[in-house]
C-alpha cells in the first residue's frame, strides 16, 4: 500500500470541514479591511528565501525542500508565504508607484522538520501582506484583524508585542548585543551560528540554558530611537483603546530575519503550553533586499493546522447543511436527478442513486450532516409530492414538488 509521505497529511471529513471554516472566517474579516486575494507559486528560486528569510534562520539553514530542476535552476518548495508575495509585488512593478496594496493568501508551505502535533512538513497558512503604508496605525489594524478572526472562531489567545527598531537604532543595539554575547560562554551551536549572521536572532533561541544566559541581555525596546519609541507607544495606545490585552515581550524577534519595528505573536495554551498560532510584523527593508524600490510592508501568517487542532479539541458540533434527496425505488432516480439539477442552482444537494428503505436513507442523510431530507416512493409519485423531513427541527410532512422552492 502506498501511504502519504511522513509529515504530510490528507485533509478530509472533519479536518476539511474545519479548514473551510477557518478560511471562510479569515476571508470574511480581511475583506472587510480591504484585502484582496493573491496566489503565488509553490515552487520558487532558492535565492528568494535565502535573501528574504535569511541565512541565519532555521528555515534556510535546515528545513528547505530544495533541489536542482531539469533546467539547472536551484529551486525550493516555499517554506513561507511573505517572500513570494513581495517577489510578485516587485515583479509587477507595483513598488514603483505610491498606491497601497493589500493582499491575502492561503495554501501549502513546506519545511523539512520533525513532525509533531500541530507541526507538519506540508502545512497550511493564511496570511496577509500590506504594502506602501508606513503608518503604525496599519500595524495596529493588522493586529486587530487577527483579534477579530480569533474572536469569531472563539479561540483564546495571548498577544505578545515588541519593537525591533529601525536602521537608525538597530546598529548601536546590535553592537551592544554582540559585546554581551561575547562575554558569555555556553551558548548552543545554533546561537553561535546566529551570533555571526544575525545576533538578534539569538534572543529567539528556545534552549532553556541559552535563555538563562540571556536574562541580563540588553533589551531592544529600551534602545529605540525617538521615532520608533513614539510608534511603539501609539501601537500600545490603540490596542488598549480597542480593549485588546497584550504583553510587551522584549525578547520577541520572530523567526525570520526580515522584520523591523513592530513584531507580534499570538500564542495559545489550548494545544500545548505557549504554542504560537499566528505572528507577523513590519518588514520595510525586505522590498529593498529583493531589488525593489525602498518601501513599506507589514503582514501576518497563521498556522491553519494549529487552529484546526484547537477547534477539534473544543468538539464543536458540525453544522447541518444541504438536502439529501433519495428514492425507495430505482425507477424514480431519473426524475429525482431532474429535481436535483434545478435545486442545485440555489442549494447544496446530495442525491442518492441507490434504492433503500426509509430508515437506511435517513441514517445516510444523518451521516452526511444534511439539514433537509427528501424522499420519493410510489405514494409520492402518485401525488406528485415528496416526503420532507427537517433533520434539525425534526419536522416532517408531504410537500408538492411544485412547492419545493417555496418550502426550501
Swiss-Prot record:
Catalysed reactions listed for this entry: tRNA(His) + L-histidine + ATP = L-histidyl-tRNA(His) + AMP + diphosphate + H(+)
UniProt entry tagged with the keyword Protein biosynthesis: yes
Pfam families: HGTP_anticodon, tRNA-synt_His
Cellular-component GO terms for this entry: cytoplasm
PANTHER family reported for this sequence: HISTIDINE--TRNA LIGASE, MITOCHONDRIAL-RELATED, HISTIDYL-TRNA SYNTHETASE
Domain of life of the native organism: Bacteria
CDD domains xref list: HisRS-like_core
Assembly information from the UniProt record: Homodimer.
Location(s), subcellular: Cytoplasm
InterPro entries xref list: aa-tRNA-synth_II (IPR006195), aa-tRNA-synth_II/BPL/LPL (IPR045864), Anticodon-bd (IPR004154), Anticodon-bd_dom_sf (IPR036621), His-tRNA-ligase (IPR015807), HisRS-like_core (IPR041715), HisRS/HisZ (IPR004516)
Gene Ontology terms, MF aspect: ATP binding; histidine-tRNA ligase activity
Enzyme Commission number(s) of this protein: 6.1.1.21
Name this protein carries in UniProt: Histidine--tRNA ligase
Alphabetical list of NCBIfam families matching this protein: hisS (TIGR00442)
An individual GO BP term: histidyl-tRNA aminoacylation
Keywords: Aminoacyl-tRNA synthetase, ATP-binding, Cytoplasm, Ligase, Nucleotide-binding, Protein biosynthesis
Family indicated by similarity: Belongs to the class-II aminoacyl-tRNA synthetase family.
Amino acid at each position: 500500500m502506498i501511504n502519504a509521505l511522513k509529515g504530510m497529511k490528507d485533509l478530509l471529513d472533519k479536518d476539511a470541514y474545519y479548514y473551510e471554516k477557518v478560511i471562510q472566517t479569515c476571508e470574511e474579516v480581511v475583506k472587510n479591511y480591504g484585502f484582496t486575494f493573491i496566489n503565488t507559486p509553490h515552487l520558487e528560486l532558492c535565492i528568494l528565501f535565502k535573501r528574504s528569510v535569511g541565512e541565519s534562520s532555521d528555515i534556510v539553514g535546515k528545513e528547505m525542500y530544495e533541489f536542482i530542476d531539469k533546467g539547472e535552476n536551484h529551486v525550493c518548495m516555499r517554506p513561507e508565504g511573505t517572500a513570494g508575495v513581495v517577489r510578485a509585488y516587485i515583479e509587477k512593478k507595483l513598488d514603483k508607484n505610491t498606491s497601497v496594496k493589500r493582499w491575502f493568501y492561503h495554501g501549502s508551505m513546506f519545511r523539512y522538520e520533525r513532525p509533531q502535533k500541530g507541526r507538519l512538513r506540508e502545512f497550511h497558512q493564511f496570511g496577509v501582506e500590506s504594502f506602501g503604508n508606513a503608518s503604525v496605525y496599519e500595524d495596529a489594524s493588522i493586529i486587530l484583524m487577527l483579534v477579530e478572526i480569533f474572536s469569531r472562531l472563539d479561540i483564546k489567545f495571548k498577544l505578545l508585542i515588541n519593537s525591533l527598531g529601525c536602521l537608525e537604532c538597530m546598529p548601536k543595539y546590535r553592537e551592544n548585543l554582540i559585546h554581551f554575547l561575547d562575554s558569555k560562554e555556553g551558548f548552543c551551536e545554533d546561537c553561535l551560528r546566529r551570533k555571526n549572521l544575525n545576533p538578534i536572532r539569538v534572543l529567539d533561541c528556545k534552549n532553556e540554558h541559552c535563555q538563562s544566559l540571556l536574562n541580563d541581555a540588553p533589551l531592544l525596546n529600551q534602545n529605540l530611537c525617538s521615532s520608533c519609541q513614539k510608534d511603539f507607544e501609539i501601537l500600545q495606545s490603540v490596542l488598549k483603546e480597542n480593549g485588546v490585552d497584550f504583553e510587551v515581550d522584549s525578547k520577541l524577534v520572530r523567526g525570520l530575519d526580515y522584520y523591523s519595528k513592530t513584531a507580534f505573536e499570538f500564542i495559545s495554551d489550548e494545544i500545548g503550553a505557549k504554542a504560537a498560532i499566528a505572528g507577523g510584523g513590519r518588514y520595510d527593508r525586505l522590498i529593498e533586499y529583493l531589488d525593489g524600490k525602498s518601501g513599506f510592508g507589514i503582514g501576518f501568517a497563521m498556522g491553519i493546522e494549529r487552529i484546526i487542532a484547537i477547534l477539534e479539541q473544543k468538539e464543536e458540533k458540525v453544522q447541518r447543511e444541504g438536502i439529501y434527496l433519495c428514492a425507495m425505488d430505482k425507477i424514480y432516480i431519473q426524475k429525482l436527478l431532474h429535481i436535483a439539477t434545478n435545486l442545485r442552482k440555489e442549494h447544496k444537494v446530495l442525491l442518492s442513486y441507490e434504492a433503500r428503505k426509509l430508515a437506511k436513507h435517513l441514517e445516510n442523510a444523518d451521516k452526511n450532516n444534511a439539514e433537509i431530507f427528501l424522499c420519493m416512493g410510489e405514494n409520492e409519485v402518485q401525488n406528485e409530492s415528496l416526503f420532507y423531513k427537517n433533520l434539525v427541527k425534526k419536522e416532517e410532512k408531504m410537500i408538492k414538488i411544485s412547492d419545493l422552492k417555496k418550502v426550501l
